[in-house]
Each structure stands twice: as structure tokens, then as C-alpha cells.
């Protein structure tokens, strides 16, 4: 289970980076919940989470630096680049906690060590709590 959990979250980031939204959606539980405690943003449901990623502004990339996984959960440490092929672009470290059940991602919680205000969202799925 641990290796499959690790593989699942790596597929999540690979599909996101590739903008392969069909593959991305297949990894998600219908009742997925996504939260960002720092900005108090929340998205409920796989369709909302997909829309959140699909409409993220800019040509970004998330490079996975580390994965720690055990049965039913995983953590990734990311180097998030705001411009895919520009090494001079802004970079942020992201720490993402995943919960997994029955081979699907059920909960995602993002932590960003640097303070920031979220960018304007094109997705109507994002609410603040």
C-alpha cells in the first residue's frame, strides 16, 4: 500500500505538470476535499479540484523534491515554479499532504512556508473559510 500511495501522488503531480486532465481526474475521489490553511481556501469535490488546477494562472510547474508515504497517506515537498521553463522565475516551496482511500485521493492539504495572498481565481469552485 505504501508504494502504491507514493506512486499515486507522483502520478498526480506528473498529470498536473503535463496538463493531462483526464489522467489527473482518474486519481481523485468524487468527494475529495482540498484546503489551504494559510489562505483559508477550500474546494470540495473532484470536479472542483480539477477545475482549480485546470484554471491555475500562468505556465507553472511543480517539481517533486521529496515524497514520504505510508498506508493511506503521503506528503510531497515541491519546488513550485511560476514559469515552467524560466529558471529566473519566482519559486515557492510547497508541502502537500494527501489522504488516499481505495486507490483514490480523498483529501489534499497544501502548506506554503512563504506568506502570500492567492492569485485571482478563474475557478468558481474556490471558497474562503
Language-model-detected regions and their locations in the chain:
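Conserved, charge-rich beta-strand/loop surface module that forms ligand/interface-binding patches
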Residues: 45
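Structured beta->alpha junctions
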Residues: 13, 38, 66-68
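A short gly/proline-enriched turn/hairpin at secondary-structure junctions
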Residues: 33-42, 111
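Alpha-helix C-capping/helix-to-loop hinge sites
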Residues: 12-15, 34-35, 59, 81-83
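An acidic, carboxylate-rich microenvironment
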Residues: 23, 48-51
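Structural detector for helix-capping/boundary residues
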Residues: 30-31, 103
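Short, low-complexity N-terminal intrinsically disordered segments enriched in polar/charged residues
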Residues: 1-30, 119-129
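A beta-strand edge to alpha-helix "cap/lid" segment located at domain peripheries
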Residues: 1-4, 50-129
Amino acid at each position: 500500500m505504501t508504494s502504491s500511495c507514493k506512486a499515486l501522488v507522483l502520478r498526480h503531480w506528473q498529470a498536473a505538470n503535463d496538463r493531462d486532465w483526464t489522467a489527473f481526474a482518474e486519481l481523485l475521489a468524487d468527494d475529495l476535499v482540498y484546503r489551504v490553511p494559510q489562505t483559508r481556501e477550500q474546494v470540495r469535490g473532484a470536479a472542483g479540484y480539477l477545475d482549480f488546477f485546470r484554471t491555475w494562472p500562468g505556465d507553472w510547474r511543480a517539481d517533486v523534491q521529496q515524497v514520504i508515504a505510508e498506508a493511506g497517506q503521503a506528503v510531497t515537498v515541491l519546488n513550485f515554479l511560476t514559469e515552467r521553463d524560466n529558471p529566473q522565475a519566482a519559486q515557492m516551496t510547497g508541502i502537500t499532504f494527501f489522504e488516499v482511500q481505495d486507490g483514490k485521493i480523498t483529501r489534499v492539504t497544501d502548506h506554503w512556508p512563504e506568506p502570500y495572498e492567492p492569485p485571482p481565481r478563474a475557478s468558481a469552485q474556490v471558497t474562503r473559510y
